[in-house]
Amino acid sequence: MSGPADPAPPLAPWLARARDALLRQRGHAWLLQGPSGLGQYELALALASAWLCEQPGPQGACGHCASCHAIKVRTHADLCVLMPEVAMHELGWPLDEKAQSEIDDKKRKPSREIRVEAMRDAVGFAQRTSARGRGKVVLVYPAERMNAISANALLKTLEEPAGDLRFVLASEAAWQLLPTIRSRCLGHTLPWPSAQEAQEWLVAQGIAAAEAAVLLRAAGGRPDAALRLARNGPSPKAWGLLPRAMQRGDVAALADQAPPAAIEALQKLCHDL
């Protein structure tokens, strides 16, 4: 993953089209939904960046103003990001000082759900005045990682939003959200790109064309998931051999994979079947 201060890569074309369409619509809360691997987080961040940008255009944030820079370096005072701590770390977002200290001192492990303490901080954030005068944004990803207490705290803020506050919830399992949260948001289902468009995007990320097709099949047609496989999973050749190996009961094909990676590989294989 690139560092948080690096220039943001351009959105995949199917996400850029969705961003442009959503920016033409009004609403204080959006729910971006669809299977994992389609780019919910990237689209959510693009919307937040555009809403907070000092010089936004029809295609979103300018990428050069002070607001855009603050988002790139993860210090924007008007953007509140709610994620499991594991996801915060993976995506380059800093934890608050207390949480980071608890983890550094090995008092606990990074959370895999959105913590109640973080949601309470977000409620306080919602009540503050915008620091830069462009409103405020709360980004929640993956939204289904809220527990019941966190979800109810968010619901109250959704029901009584401040005039300059927007929400963007990105979910890979929207059916797990409270129905009342879903009803308070404008829903948008992420589009599936065509195989050709997805393969072209993977090639643009540095994946060989022949490998892109194999990885895309292994990921069930989901481009982001295919890119993660290219960087962290078995080789494309191994993916190509995996179905027959499993038919033979040959578990050696996954012998060099850590248990979580092996489980994910089998899940993707079952998805394809």
Language model: regions and residue ranges:
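Charged, glycine-rich active-site and insertion segments that engage polyanionic ligands
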Residues: M1-A50, P58-Q59, A66-S67, G163-R166, ...
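Clamp-loader machinery-focused feature within the broader ASCE/P-loop NTPase space
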Residues: S2-I149
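Short gly/ser-rich anion-binding loops that grip negatively charged ligand groups
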Residues: R108-R112, F167, D256
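Conserved adenine-binding aromatic site and its adjacent loop/helix in ATP-hydrolyzing domains
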Residues: G124, K156, S183
